[in-house]
C-alpha cells in the first residue's frame, strides 16, 4: 500500500463516519482532505497532503499496520478533532476494506510512494 492509498482510505473512513455531521470544522477538514478533487496525487488543499506525507516519512505502509498509522495521523490534525472516528475501529473490518479497495481500480494505484 502506498501513502496516497492510505490517505484515500482515511478520507473514505472519515467521510463515512461524519456523513451526517453539521460541524463546520469537520466539514472543512474533509473538504481540504479530498484526494479526488484534482487529477494529481494529493488533496484539495495541497498543504494537507504535504503534512500527511511529512507524518508518514519513510514508514513502510502495509494493510496490517495501516490502521495504527491512520490513528496516529488523525491525532496530529490540529484543525478539527476527528479522532473519534478511529476510536472503536474493528481491525479485521478495516483490513477487509483496505483489501477490497486495493483490489479494485483506483486513483494512485501506480504511485510508488
Question: Where in the sequence are the language-model features?
Answer:
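Disulfide-bonded cysteine-rich modules in secreted/extracellular proteins
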Residues: 2, 6-9, 61-73
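Short, tandemly repeated low-complexity microdomains enriched for cysteine and small residues
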Residues: 21-34, 79-88
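Polar/charged alpha-helical tracts
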Residues: 28, 32, 54, 64, ...
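Amphipathic alpha-helical binding modules
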Residues: 69-113
Amino acid at each position: 500500500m502506498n501513502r496516497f492509498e492510505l490517505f484515500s482510505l482515511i478520507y473514505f473512513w472519515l467521510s463515512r463516519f461524519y456523513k451526517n455531521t453539521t460541524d463546520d470544522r469537520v466539514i472543512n477538514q474533509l473538504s481540504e482532505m479530498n484526494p479526488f478533487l484534482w487529477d494529481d496525487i494529493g488533496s484539495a488543499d495541497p498543504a494537507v497532503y504535504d503534512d500527511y506525507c511529512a507524518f508518514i516519512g519513510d514508514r513502510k505502509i502495509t494493510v496490517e499496520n495501516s490502521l495504527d498509522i491512520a490513528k496516529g495521523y488523525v491525532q496530529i490534525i490540529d484543525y478539527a478533532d476527528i479522532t473519534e472516528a478511529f476510536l472503536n475501529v474493528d481491525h479485521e473490518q478495516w483490513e477487509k476494506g483496505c483489501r477490497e479497495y486495493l483490489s479494485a481500480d483506483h486513483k494512485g494505484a501506480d504511485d510508488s510512494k
